[in-house]
Amino acid sequence: MKTKTAIISIVNLKVEDLTVLRPVLQALPGVDKIDFNVERSVAVIDFDPSQSHIDDFLRAVLKAGFQVS
């Protein structure tokens, strides 16, 4: 499987937000790995581009009640 990496900036990301965001993003098809950097307010997602697209991740983050930058 050839993977791509998406880096999404999330406004004011906090450690406690990860309990909401991680399952939301992991539920999307093709997600292989998710890392968060709270200091930089980013989610780093490795995924299979034949199953998902960065727009899917952006929509999921927004739907979960967060803002992206």
Language model regions located:
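Short, surface-exposed ligand-recognition loops at beta-strand->loop->(often short) alpha-helix junctions
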Residues: I8-D17
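Short, ordered beta-strand-loop transition motifs
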Residues: M1, N37-V38
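Short hydrophobic/aromatic patches at helix-to-coil boundaries
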Residues: G65-S69
